[in-house]
Structures are given as structure tokens and as C-alpha cells.
Amino acid sequence: MGAYILRRLALMIPTIVGIMGISFLVIQFAPGGPVEQVVAQLTGQGDSASDRLSGGGDLMGQSGGFDESGSKYRGAQGLDPELIKKLEKQFGFDKPPLTRFLEMMWNYIRFDFGDSFFRNSSVIDLIIDKLPVSASLGFWILIISYVISIPLGIKKAVSDGSTFDVWTSGIIIIGYAVPSFLFGILLIVLFAGGSFFDWFPLRGLVSDNFDQLNWWQKIIDYFWHLTLPLIALSLSAFATTTLLTKNSFIDEIKKQYVVTARAKGLSERKVLYGHVFRNAMLIVIAGFPGAFISAFFTGSLLIENIFSLDGLGRLGYLSVVNRDYPIVFGTLFIFSLMGLVVGLLSDLIYTWIDPRIDFERRDV
């Protein structure tokens, strides 16, 4: 097991380098950049969101074409070339791409993520500041999905092939197939003052007068704001855990020890929860870390933007739009590293739950 852990840890290095390298390369060829952002502001261009996404008006990428004045940044005509050089030095673009990448990776290895280009704060402080919002979404989605999915999966396994099983499978698959942001938009239209009811707030995690509320009013206000985002995210979170639980129970129910337990006269409930449950839930429990990371990082980006929740997903989106590269690459590095570590942790949990799994190589 020790050798397996060392191999996995060693593989994390080229994996991280590959992820960061490909992302860095894509950024180099993408239109726009922080220099163009400042140039666009100085020249009065690129005020709209669509302009920002395309790099600001008719501005070109970092490696884009030249304008009539000889600058490699379109829209920079009329600006002092020394100012352009200062901007390049400020954002680090006075160095070759390979040098910038190597310096960035060296800093990240030391967990030095630098400062945001436009937010006057360090990347790590911004992540810590936005973390509670995303953590709240991820935590409650995970709890809700497991609390509902496990009993539902057991019920589907017991009634495999029944009308209940068929209909719930259809509903689960539809919920999984439809993107969560579409559910979010539908919920806003229906229940957040869109066209029908105005029952829930449209934006934010808490009300403006949150600090003036007493403790129980704060709890109600907090969940009142979370209701629609959680519903939108949870509808697509049930499928994997529910079907995994169902299939795991079906596999266990067919085994000989279940037949023996029933032959002894044990009730079906005793067989299911006294014998089958412990074995069937091993794979579900072992997947808990991976499910947490999935709920924590992947599902909330669009939901945070739709409901104006100031979390990591919204931070990442705005950073990409504004070409704030330290935040983009810093969050990518942290999330990639956490994903790899959690993947290793999931494998170790498998071995802890089921000692028959050891991941050791055996000669045939």
C-alpha cells in the first residue's frame, strides 16, 4: 500500500503540470488579456460584457496582430509606448511565455499565488473570503442528496422492475439530463418574482438587514435564500447516488448470505438493514469524498451567477471575463490539487472499508 500511495503522489506532479500547462497555453491563444483590459478602459472601449469576453471591442489577444501605430495591442494607437511597456511589466508580459509559466509553477509549489490584477487583494484571501458561500452550497447539496438518494435507492432495489422503479428512474434521468441552471431559471420565473409568485429572494445569500436579525431569524433568512439554489442543484445530484445505491443493493440481495438469512426466518427489514445494508453501502460511502468535491466545485458556477451568490464559482467566472489571470490559475491549481488528493483519499477509504482491496501489483 505504501508503494501505491507513493506512485499516486508521484503521478500528481505531471498531472498538475499538464493541467496548468494546457490551460496556460489556451490562455496564450485566447483573445484579450489584462493589458487589453486597461487599454480598453483608457481608450473608452470594451464596456459591455460581450466586449470583455472577446477581449474588449476589437482588441486582439496577447499574441494578436498589430495596429496601425505598430503596437501589438489593437486600440492602443495614440498611447505612449512607455505606458504600454509599464503595463506589460506590471502584468508580467515583458517576459517570454515559458519563463512566466515556470515562475508561476515555482510560486505555486510554494503556495504563493500572488495578487489579483484588479481586486487589490491576494488570491488566497479572495478564495478564503468566497469559500463559505460555495462550502454552504456544496455541504447542503451533499447532505440532501445522500439523505434522499440512499432510501430511494434501497426502495428501488427492493421493488426492481415495478411501476415505482420505472417512473422514479425516468424522473431521475430527466433531472440528471437537464442542466441545473435551467432549473434555476425556471424556479426564478415561477417563485422569485419572475411571472408568477414572489415567494423567495432573487439574489444573495442573506438579506441586507441580516446583522439586525436575532439568531433564529438569521437561520430562517439563510435557508430562505438558499432554497431555490439548493433545489436547482439537488435535482441533478440525486441520480448518481440513487442508481449506485440501487445497483449495489441488487448485487448484494442476490448473494448466498441473504438467502441464508431469509431461510433463518429473519424479517425482510432485518435482512436489508442488518445484513445487506452494511455491505451494499461500502461503495457509496467510499465515494463520499469524490461526491463532496463534485458538489463543491462543479455544480455551483452557473447557479452562483444566476442567483448572484458571491462564491468561488462567481469569482472564477468574473476572473475569466476580466482576464484576472492570477485568480484563474490560482483557483485552477488549488482545485486540481484537491481533486487529485481526494481521489487518492477515496481509494484509501475503499481499502479501509474492504481490506480485500490493496491495489498491489501481482505477477501472473
Swiss-Prot record:
Q: Which UniProt keywords apply?
A: Cell inner membrane, Cell membrane, Membrane, Peptide transport, Protein transport, Transmembrane, Transmembrane helix, Transport
Name the GO cellular-component terms. Answer: plasma membrane
Biological classification of the source: Bacteria, Pseudomonadati, Pseudomonadota, Alphaproteobacteria, Hyphomicrobiales
Report the InterPro entries cross-referenced here.
Answer: MetI-like, MetI-like_sf
**Subunit relationships:** The complex is composed of one ATP-binding protein (YejF), two transmembrane proteins (YejB and YejE) and a solute-binding protein (YepA or YejA).
Keyword check for Electron transport, yes or no: no
Name the membrane topology term.
Multi-pass membrane protein
The residues covered by the ABC transmembrane type-1 domain are 131-350
Q: Which residues cross the membrane?
A: 9-29, 134-154, 171-191, 219-239, 283-303, 325-345
Name of the coding gene: yejB
Which compartment or compartments is the protein found in? Answer: Cell inner membrane
In UniProt terms, what function does this protein have? Answer: Part of the ABC transporter complex YejBEF-YepA involved in the uptake of muropeptides, the breakdown products of cell wall peptidoglycan. The import of muropeptides into the cell enables peptidoglycan recycling, which is vital for cell wall integrity in this bacterium. Is also probably part of the ABC transporter complex YejABEF, which is likely involved in broad-spectrum peptide import. Responsible for the translocation of the substrate across the membrane.
- CDD domains on file: TM_PBP2
Q: Can you tell me which family this protein belongs to?
A: Belongs to the binding-protein-dependent transport system permease family.
Null-mutant phenotype, please? The deletion mutant is hypersensitive to ampicillin, in a manner only partly dependent on the beta-lactamase AmpC. Deletion of the yejABEF operon leads to the accumulation of anhydromuramyl tri-, tetra- and pentapeptides in large quantities in the extracellular milieu. The yejABEF mutant displays cell swelling and lysis as well as a severe growth defect.
- Tell me which PROSITE patterns the record gives: ABC_TM1
Can you name this protein?
Answer: Peptidoglycan transport system permease protein YejB
Organism, by scientific name, is Agrobacterium fabrum (strain C58 / ATCC 33970)
The biological processes this protein is annotated with in GO are:
microcin transport; peptide transport; protein transport; transmembrane transport
